[in-house]
Amino acid sequence: MIELKKNNKNGRFGNTIFKSIAVGSAYELLRKDTIDHLAVIQNELHFKYCRFHGLFHDDMAVVRRDQNGNLAFQWHHIDKITDSLLSLGLKPFFELSSMPKALVGDVELKYGFPAGWKMITNEPEDYNEWGKLVERFVSHLVDRYGLDEVKTWYFEVWNEPNLKGFWPAGMEAYLEKLYPYAAFAVKKVSNELKVGGPATAGGEFVAEFIENCCKNNIPVDFVSTHAYPIGEYCEYDERVGSPYKLGEYFSGRFKEVEDAVANSSMPNLEIHWTEWNTQSGNTSKNITWTMNPTVDSHFGGACVVKNMLSIMDKCDSVAYWVASDIFSEAGQAHSVFSCTYGLLNIQGIKKATFNAYKLLRNMRGGIMDCINGDKLMLGCGICAAEENGVIRIIAYNQQLLEIENQPDWNESIIVPVDEDGDYSVTTAKIEKGHGSCYETWVDMGAPQNISKIQEEALRYAGMMNYGIQPKVSADKFVNVEFNLKADEVIYIEIQKKDIKALPRVISDEDMKLLNDNLMLAKK
């Protein structure tokens, strides 16, 4: 039995979780189905920013050489995707990458991961031209959208420069050349614009980045970096030497970056985690970034809730990578489910991860209580918030991949209320076949292509399991019981019963007029 406490010192359920969402690449935002999927997401989840790769990829056709060898710029594609995002209520979180071929010169091209995407990762032949590209781009945005709007956007320099697959020149070249040239170019347009980095993998180089900017008077308004749960097995072979308790690597990395900024020369910098998703593992021998079913299955729903609750007070934003399985970085998804990272699959069917965010979106108000870690069974947690007398609770039972058998979590919770009387209790649950359709697809035989009725069945399986207890009596407390199997999530909403709905009332005079008109019609 758990007795939830009312603690007004816990703060409010923040919007950190919903400040940003990611899309694979800028070019994908030219596709109507990508925009349609974002519209579905925005209709229910309401993110504020959208971040994506490849703004300067050659498929965006932003720069070329004219007949005299001078740089010529064209912003049509970027304008189109920016307009689309703004129409959906999304502001751009621009990642300034990759390197256009026109800036590289006559050298062998280096392509980042995956090679098939043709993302050029060479250094520019002349860093002044890199700065010019950024300045002309930002200047165009201000001309088109106005400074008051553009100063609310973010400009992040590059993507994961600490990985050779994305920036072979290394961190020294990033810190001393790539970032400074871009940052000064942004600020040349207006000092009110926000620029930052280092956009590293694994929360690395944040402290070094800040100190380098301070030492050399390089502009910086925020820090950004990435983390994935599976990262622990990349850093620590079979977790040997890992300082993190089982299941706490992800939140631990967030805390380390939070501390690094707090202890730096610029302790008030915003912290943005511009990539994360539910990719997890249980061994260093079989790490996979492209065939990991944790992004499709009901595991993902519990993973989202567990990790977002653990970090929502440790940063300014955290962007799920990515919105939709319309994602071409490693080749377009080739089946209904393909271990692609989207909240929606290629048909726009909602995964467990989408539903987890939907339940988290319902959580609002002052945080009453949050319980996890050593106080509960491994992998379990619960959080409650209250607003205007309505109490909202979310609980999860995450089966960590290292655990072979996760017990059911049978619980009774005692919830304090302000008034005695009758309450209604409404629940929504993510489970296999209800809020998680991946398992239903597997039961179908995992077909590569599906019929219309199969698609409808999967959409139905993607709907959560709802329940209601219409009358629960309270004497200072409401008692609620639930059962969660492995990787299930439940949302519970408790509110005072309202007055019974009144029937439609028609006055005697109006009724007489109606009857008289009916009689006339019969004649």
Task: Give the residues covered by each predicted segment.
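Mature N-terminal, pre-catalytic/accessory segment of carbohydrate-active enzymes
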Residues: M1-K48, A486, K496-K523
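Conserved, mostly hydrophobic/aromatic
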Residues: S20, L85, F137, F155, ...
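Short, acidic/polar
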Residues: E28-Q42, F205-C213, G301-N307
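Glycoside hydrolase catalytic-domain groove-lining segments
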Residues: H37, G231-I287, N307, D313-D325, ...
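Substrate-binding cleft and catalytic face of glycoside hydrolase catalytic domains
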Residues: L45-K245
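Aromatic/acidic polysaccharide-binding cleft in carbohydrate-active enzymes
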Residues: E275-Q406
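Carbohydrate-binding surface patches
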Residues: M377-G421, T426-D443, A486-Q495
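C-terminal beta-strand-rich structural cap/linker in extracellular carbohydrate-active enzymes
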Residues: N449-K523
